[in-house]
């Protein structure tokens, strides 16, 4: 898709963009067809510097944190430096399957007890490796952008005593699988060599505040059957796919953290059909339940079924972090985990606001290298890198407030166990990590031991500048939308606090909308996203008349059979989006104008809607539907195609606790306005919340000065009166000034001073006349001093 599909405004486009594959057979047995054979090899573990044990097909005896593996490929000895992916599984990681009676069985295995590794090949600077060591070794070994291998175990009947594995050139592998190169094809199909991860990414990733995608993967019942109803095999398949997805997402500086796996061992828990659109939205509806029990960022369904046409994956664009749309579906279409992982990464890319790469956009990898992940159609070899266009779209998505949940792990050490210095990722026990010594120009960090240089406080993060922590209150993430909230450096961490936003239901857009997952959807905004800045919502009678019809011109969505549903009158504003004005054609490709006319007060009124072309090959949700969270009346909001009460008891309770001194954030804490202090906005302070970091005024010295003055100023009148009482009479007589004794208070009052009973009027700006002069024996001062007795010239200080 072109750049016009981007969403400059607020809420996500619920547009489904599938990844297309050629209609050639992709699923096969473990062995390749025909007489295809790779080179027979036996990898060996190397522990404590010596050859230790050959890699067998059994479950590994050891699962070390780091290990060397030796093998030979095409007469060349390769030494793989492998490291267990400690960040792959989150603390609290769970695995769920079901008993025959339908009850779930939830296990909490040790989140470090797995056999998924990554690493590099010693002596090859551009190399990278992604391997599973469960039941032998399988995975990718990339030496350079031109040379890559796939290693996999041989079937048990073929191994006898040795060798235990086969290694293939990737181009061999795909040629044997019957995929022919066709330069004129709309699909990419070429000899495979997978691109390496750019080394420049290492420093970029370390220097920014990290982003983590907390993922929950579900395998449907068909996939479980295809794995011969073997729960452990299904589990390993999902972990291998997740391991590869993580490697792909790292090219976007995003790290995957798996919070859980679920296998539908007895039956599917959401409706799964050959219709990808129907399957997706049924799954997203089911996803709400698991998300409520175990919050995470994205839920991905991996199905063993085949969808109609060439669609192998589907996801809502910009759906990430949203309860109703943060997920996707992918078919397990490839024998290789990398193939299925490329599809899942593509769909996650859509959730992150990425559209299909236009022609000429992918310069990072050509067809022979797999191309780029976000190309609309892909074949063999599978892509492994995101294009520069995708990276730009992602930056735009983050700038406008998208993906706040990806920043909710502000301290990477929370997810880390043993680490390896020099890999470019800040891990447990490291103060910094700028990559290898040859490529580490960082003035803050020692590359050889990942420690800070003398005098340095930090090396990475948005709250680190010139090796020093930014002061508390320095803005590090401004509010991006009406429903977003700013974050500030804490002064103790180099990372910006987790991204928070207004609690769902908070009013936004001057009361025309209500916040939902950090967005502020309004009818005006949605019309302008479809038709341009000159568009506006159609009159309400358009919605009432058209959406009650229950056809393609007006409806409240579709049922599971694809039939249009009419809207009830109260729900009319939550159905088909109807607009007026703007561009003659929609700004989004594959969508056409559908104008309808109604009579309103004796005149014809055009109600403009949008319709997806049936032959567009985009099996997508009707983009012309009003988005969830859109206001549909006073204190009313659209949810599930119904106009519902927007009043939230949770929001009301939170606002009450904030003493009307602030708003409520997504963690249900008070975000105080300037002048009030968290946590409850009931005491003077700078504003902000316990989640955002301490706010700071534009002039960091102004607030302490104001607090000092607010304390001292009330004392000045009393201090002045005391000074007058004790010092001024003596001063007057010494200077020859005449004073008089006040008989009421029995004290001297200097001329021009204020009587205590008149203090209130002085404060309100009403000057009192000075007391009359009295006779003195001497008056040595010239008459010019009489101005002190002139009320018109009196000044109060």
UniProtKB/Swiss-Prot annotation:
Localization per record: Membrane
Residues making up the propeptide: 30-204
Keyword annotations of the record: Cleavage on pair of basic residues, Disulfide bond, EGF-like domain, Glycoprotein, Hydrolase, Membrane, Metal-binding, Metalloprotease, Protease, Signal, Transmembrane, Transmembrane helix, Zinc, Zymogen
Transmembrane segment boundaries: 703-723
Coiled coil stretches, renumbered: none
GO CC terms of this entry: membrane
Disulfide bonding pattern of the chain: 321-405, 361-389, 362-372, 476-496, 654-664, 658-670, 672-681
Membrane topology category: Single-pass type I membrane protein
Details of cofactor binding: Binds 1 zinc ion per subunit.
Residue intervals annotated with topology Extracellular: 30-702
Record domain EGF-like: where: 650-682
Pfam family, one: Pep_M12B_propep
Its EC number(s): 3.4.24.-
Matching SUPFAM superfamilies: Blood coagulation inhibitor (disintegrin), Metalloproteases ('zincins'), catalytic domain
Residue span of region Disordered: 766-797
Domain (Peptidase M12B) ranges: 211-410
Co-factor requirement: Zn(2+)
Modifications the protein undergoes after translation, according to the UniProt entry: The precursor is cleaved by a furin endopeptidase.
Protein name as catalogued: Disintegrin and metalloproteinase domain-containing protein 33
Species whose genome carries this gene: Mus musculus (Mouse)
Taxon lineage: Eukaryota, Metazoa, Chordata, Craniata, Vertebrata
Gene: Adam33
């Amino acid at each position: 898709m072109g750049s016009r599909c981007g969403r400059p405004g607020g809420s996500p486009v619920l547009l489904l963009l599938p990844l297309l594959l050629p209609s050639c057979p992709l699923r096969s047995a473990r062995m390749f067809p025909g007489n295809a054979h790779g080179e027979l090899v036996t990898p060996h573990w190397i522990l404590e510097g010596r050859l230790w044990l050959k890699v067998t097909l059994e479950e590994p005896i050891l699962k070390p944190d780091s290990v060397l593996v030796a093998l030979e490929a095409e007469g060349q000895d390769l030494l793989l430096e492998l490291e267990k992916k400690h960040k792959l599984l989150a603390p609290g990681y769970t695995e769920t399957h079901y008993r025959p009676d339908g009850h779930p069985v939830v296990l909490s295995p040790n989140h470090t007890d797995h056999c998924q590794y990554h690493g590099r090949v010693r002596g090859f600077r551009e190399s990278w490796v992604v391997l599973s060591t469960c039941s032998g070794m399988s995975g990718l070994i990339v030496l350079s952008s031109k040379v890559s291998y796939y290693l996999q175990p041989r079937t048990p009947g073929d191994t006898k005593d040795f060798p235990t594995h086969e290694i293939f050139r990737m181009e061999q592998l795909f040629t044997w699988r019957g995929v022919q190169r066709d330069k004129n094809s709309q699909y990419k199909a070429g000899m495979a060599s997978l691109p390496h991860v750019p080394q420049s990414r290492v420093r970029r990733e370390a220097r920014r505040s990290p982003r983590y995608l907390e993922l929950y993967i579900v395998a449907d019942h068909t996939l479980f059957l295809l794995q011969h109803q073997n729960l452990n095999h299904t589990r390993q398949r999902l972990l291998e796919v997740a391991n590869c997805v993580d490697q792909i997402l790292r090219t976007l500086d995003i790290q995957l953290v798996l919070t859980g796996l679920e296998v539908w061992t007895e039956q599917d828990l959401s409706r799964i059909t050959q219709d990808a659109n129907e399957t997706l939205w049924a799954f997203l509806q089911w996803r709400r339940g698991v998300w409520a029990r175990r919050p995470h960022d994205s839920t991905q369904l991996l199905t063993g079924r085949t969808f109609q046409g060439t669609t192998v994956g589907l996801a809502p664009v910009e759906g990430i972090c949203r309860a109703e749309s943060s997920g996707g579906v992918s078919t397990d279409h490839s024998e290789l985990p990398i193939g299925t992982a490329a599809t899942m990464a593509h769909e996650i890319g859509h959730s992150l606001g990425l559209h299909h790469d236009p022609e000429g956009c992918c310069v990072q990898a050509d067809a022979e290298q797999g191309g780029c992940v976000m190309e609309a159609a892909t074949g063999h070899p599978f892509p492994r890198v995101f294009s520069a266009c995708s990276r730009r779209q992602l930056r735009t998505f983050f700038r406008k407030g998208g993906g706040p949940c990806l920043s909710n792990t502000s301290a990477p050490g929370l997810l880390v166990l043993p680490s390896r210095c020099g890999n470019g990722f800040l891990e447990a026990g490291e103060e910094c990590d700028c990559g290898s010594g040859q490529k580490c120009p960082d003035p803050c960090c020692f590359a050889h031991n990942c420690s800070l240089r003398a005098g340095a406080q930090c090396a990475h993060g948005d709250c680190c500048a010139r090796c020093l922590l930014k002061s508390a209150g320095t803005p590090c993430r401004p509010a991006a939308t009406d429903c977003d909230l700013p974050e500030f450096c804490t002064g103790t961490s180099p990372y910006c606090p987790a991204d928070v936003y207004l609690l769902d239901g908070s009013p936004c857009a001057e009361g025309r909308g209500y916040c939902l997952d950090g967005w502020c959807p309004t009818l005006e905004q949605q019309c302008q996203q479809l038709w341009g800045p000159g568009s506006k919502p159609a009159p309400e009678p358009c919605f009432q008349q058209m959406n009650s019809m229950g056809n393609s011109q007006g409806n409240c969505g579709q049922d599971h059979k694809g039939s249009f549903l009419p809207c009830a009158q109260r729900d009319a504003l939550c159905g088909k989006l109807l607009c007026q004005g703007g561009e003659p054609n929609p700004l989004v490709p594959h969508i056409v104008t559908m104008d309808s006319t109604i009579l309103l007060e004796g005149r014809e009124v055009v109600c403009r809607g949008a319709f997806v072309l049936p032959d567009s090959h985009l099996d997508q949700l009707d983009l012309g539907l009003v988005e969830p969270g859109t206001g549909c009346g006073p204190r009313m909001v659209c949810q599930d195609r119904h106009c519902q009460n927007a009043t939230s008891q949770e929001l009301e309770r939170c606002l009450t606790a904030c003493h009307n001194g602030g708003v409520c954030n997504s963690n249900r804490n008070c975000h105080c306005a300037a002048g009030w202090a968290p946590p409850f906005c009931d005491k003077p302070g700078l504003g902000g919340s316990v989640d955002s970091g301490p706010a700071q005024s534009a002039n960091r010295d102004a607030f302490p000065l104001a607090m000092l003055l607010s304390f001292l100023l009330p004392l000045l009148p009393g201090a002045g009166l005391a000074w007058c009482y004790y010092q001024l009479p003596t001063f007057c007589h010494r200077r020859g000034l005449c004073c008089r004794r006040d008989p009421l208070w029995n004290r001297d009052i200097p001329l021009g001073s204020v009587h205590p009973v008149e203090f209130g009027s002085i404060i309100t700006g009403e000057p009192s006349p000075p007391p009359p002069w009295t006779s003195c024996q001497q008056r040595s001062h010239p008459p010019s001093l009489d101005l002190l007795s002139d009320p018109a010239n009196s000044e109060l200080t």
